[in-house]
């Protein structure tokens, strides 16, 4: 979450240089010369790749999550706990997607940030905040499904709709408190005229931030372990029920639900595991003295892994469709109404010829009726 803090970077005609230092403003706040190391780095290819992928993620994710929100808000009946969680995940995904245009413009502008250190911190923190909100809520979704499927009928309502609302409120409150804390600390520290954002930085004198990032990584792996255990248990129980009720007409739905559960697990693994597996190396390199070659590899790898995490905002709408039968029904109803309205519109336009009014048509229809009476 804090990896987007602005450092001092150096641009030259020979390529992009990034400067690692012991303090963001050591050269301004101390009379001594800061211990800095200039590392040449060519980011033209990386910027092109990031711009392309973030643009695709922005367009697809924006459309998908707006449709998802429309569907969630279109559920007029009482929402269950799963739908409450999914609604909040969609909101978090949209907020993350709204951060992507800033990253896109930054890379298009040859990695030059012109909007100030405060907005850089706001955009970067919002990006990571909403990513971890999604991860936490997906963990609660897996726990909720495990309880509802694996417990007895009397205990299926262990997590009620009201409790899920409380959980979401707590998650958002803690996240917003952390977000405001980061912004306040940035304001107290004071800004500088750096034109760089979203990049690698050393944390030799900022071990507290490194520890905080490490805690987030540990939290992710605990949630990931919870999701794995939950969906494996869910899948086994559903497949066992499907075999027991193989003669019933609806026995196939249990096997389908089990497969969908593993698809959700696969989506989560593809998007978040590579990034968080690499985070241990990334954080360690920030605390230790590393060569310029190693820092360049770490920086570029981290940016690519972050693209995978962002891609989750495109795949979450697919997960919504797989996890909730009500959402599938509403989506089918919306599509049916859309096609029905298009069909009725085309039929109505085909009945009228260009140049004829509705009155002219009614006259031509009535004329044969008068002639038959005359006969």
Curated annotation (Swiss-Prot):
GO MF, one annotated term: G protein-coupled receptor activity
Biological source species: Mus musculus (Mouse)
Gene ablation phenotype (knockout): GPR34-deficiency mice show no difference in microglial motility but display a significantly reduced phagocytosis activity. In addition, they are more susceptible towards disseminating Cryptococcus neoformans infection with higher pathogen burden in extrapulmonary tissues after pulmonary infection. GPR34-deficient dendritic cells show a commitment to apoptosis, which could result in an altered immune response.
Record-linked InterPro entries: GPCR_Rhodpsn, GPCR_Rhodpsn_7TM, GPR34_7tmA
Induction profile: MAPKs and NF-kappa-B reduce GPR34 mRNA expression independent of TLRs and TLR stimulation also reduced GPR34 mRNA levels.
Matches recorded under Pfam families: 7tm_1 (PF00001)
Glycosylation sites: 21, 29, 35, 193, 288
Lineage: Eukaryota, Metazoa, Chordata, Craniata, Vertebrata
TM regions (residue ranges): 55-75, 82-102, 122-142, 165-185, 210-230, 263-283, 304-324
Topology of this chain in the membrane: Multi-pass membrane protein
Protein known as: Probable G-protein coupled receptor 34
Membrane-side (Extracellular) residue stretches: 1-54, 103-121, 186-209, 284-303
GO CC annotations on file: plasma membrane
Cytoplasmic side: 76-81, 143-164, 231-262, 325-375
Superkingdom of this protein's organism: Eukaryota
């Amino acid at each position: 979450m804090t990896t987007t803090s602005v450092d001092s970077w150096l641009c030259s005609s020979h390529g992009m240089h990034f400067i690692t230092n012991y303090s963001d403003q050591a050269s301004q706040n101390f009379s001594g010369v800061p211990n800095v190391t200039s590392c040449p780095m060519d980011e033209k290819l990386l910027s092109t790749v990031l711009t392309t992928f973030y643009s695709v993620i922005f367009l697809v994710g924006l459309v998908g999550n707006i449709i998802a929100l429309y569907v969630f808000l279109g559920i007029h009946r009482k929402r269950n706990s799963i739908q409450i969680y999914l609604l909040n995940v969609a909101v978090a995904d949209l907020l993350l997607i709204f951060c992507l245009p800033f990253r896109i413009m930054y890379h298009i502008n040859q990695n030059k940030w012109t909007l100030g250190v405060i907005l850089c911190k706001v955009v970067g923190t919002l990006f990571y905040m909403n990513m971890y909100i999604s991860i936490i809520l997906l963990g609660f979704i897996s726990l909720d499904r495990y309880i509802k499927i694996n417990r007895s009928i009397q205990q299926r309502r262990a997590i009620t709709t009201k409790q899920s609302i409380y959980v979401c409120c707590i998650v958002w409150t803690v996240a917003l408190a952390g977000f405001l804390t980061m912004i306040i600390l940035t304001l107290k520290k004071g800004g500088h005229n750096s034109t760089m954002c979203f990049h690698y930085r050393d944390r030799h004198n900022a071990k507290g931030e490194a520890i905080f990032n490490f805690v987030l990584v540990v939290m992710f792996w605990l949630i990931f372990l919870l999701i794995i255990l939950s969906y494996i248990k869910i899948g086994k129980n559903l497949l066992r029920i499907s075999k027991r009720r193989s003669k019933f007409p609806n026995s196939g739905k249990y096997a389908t639900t089990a497969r969908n559960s593993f698809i959700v697990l696969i989506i989560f693994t593809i998007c978040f595991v590579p990034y968080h597996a690499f985070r241990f190396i990334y954080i360690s390199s920030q605390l230790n003295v590393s060569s310029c070659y190693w820092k360049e590899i770490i920086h570029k790898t981290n940016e690519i892994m972050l693209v995978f995490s962002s891609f989750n905002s495109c795949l979450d709408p697919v997960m919504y469709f797989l996890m909730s039968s009500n959402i599938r029904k509403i989506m089918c109803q919306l599509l049916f109404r859309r096609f029905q309205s298009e069909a009725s519109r085309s039929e109505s336009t085909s009945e009228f010829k260009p140049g004829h009014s509705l009155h002219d048509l009614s006259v031509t229809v009535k004329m044969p009726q008068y002639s038959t009476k005359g006969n």
